């Protein structure tokens, strides 16, 4: 299975880079992981709603150009469906059974995802009603993908 993580913004803190690298290393056994970091657009301190929409649209264009035609796209969205770890594992397994060999997980910028990206998404996923820093969320998502593979194979890790 090919898993691509498409994110807006770059990791800055070393400890987060180390965590991402650790989960990327662990995931090598289960999938081919590709991480695409897209440049975020600068958001003025007091941006108007119109400016925010334009920024999301620009970031959305970058995201859409990074998605392959045959990819199953899962966007991170506060209005998406929440899963337990077991349900998330079953979701990924089911995608594989249905012949989806490429899954793109999309994490938007600080303003979220554009309407065009949300429209392209095959599935909208929500981890929590809380808001997380985008850099930290990247680690959380990779950990849950790793956990999902371990659960589906009945390997020790998940308790």
From Swiss-Prot:
Disulfide bonds: none annotated. GO terms for molecular function: rRNA (pseudouridine-N3-)-methyltransferase activity. Keywords: Cytoplasm, Methyltransferase, rRNA processing, S-adenosyl-L-methionine, Transferase. Its EC number is 2.1.1.177. SUPFAM superfamilies: alpha/beta knot (SSF75217). Its main location: cytoplasm. It is found in: Cytoplasm. It holds the Pfam family SPOUT_MTase. It catalyses: pseudouridine(1915) in 23S rRNA + S-adenosyl-L-methionine = N(3)-methylpseudouridine(1915) in 23S rRNA + S-adenosyl-L-homocysteine + H(+). S-adenosyl-L-methionine binds at residues 108, 127-132. One of its GO terms (cellular component) is cytoplasm. The keyword DNA damage does not apply. InterPro entries: Alpha/beta_knot_MTases, RlmH-like, tRNA_m1G_MTases_N. Belongs to the RNA methyltransferase RlmH family. Homodimer. HAMAP family: 23SrRNA_methyltr_H (MF_00658). Specifically methylates the pseudouridine at position 1915 (m3Psi1915) in 23S rRNA. This is Ribosomal RNA large subunit methyltransferase H. It comes from Clostridium acetobutylicum (strain ATCC 824 / DSM 792 / JCM 1419 / IAM 19013 / LMG 5710 / NBRC 13948 / NRRL B-527 / VKM B-1787 / 2291 / W).
């Amino acid at each position: 299975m090919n898993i691509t993580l498409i994110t807006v913004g770059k990791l800055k803190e070393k400890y987060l880079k180390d965590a991402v690298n650790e989960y990327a290393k662990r995931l090598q056994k289960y999938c081919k992981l590709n991480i695409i970091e897209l440049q975020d657009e600068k958001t003025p301190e007091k941006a108007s709603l119109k400016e925010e929409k334009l920024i999301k649209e620009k970031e959305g264009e970058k995201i859409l150009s990074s998605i392959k035609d045959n990819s199953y796209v899962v966007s991170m969205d506060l209005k998406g469906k929440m899963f337990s770890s077991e349900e998330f594992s079953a979701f990924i397994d089911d995608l594989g059974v249905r012949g989806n060999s490429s899954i793109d997980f999309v994490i938007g910028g600080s303003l979220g995802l554009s309407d065009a990206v949300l429209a392209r998404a095959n599935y909208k996923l929500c981890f929590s009603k809380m808001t997380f820093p985008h850099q930290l969320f990247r680690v959380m998502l990779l950990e849950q993908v790793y956990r999902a593979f371990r659960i589906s194979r009945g390997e020790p890790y998940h308790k």
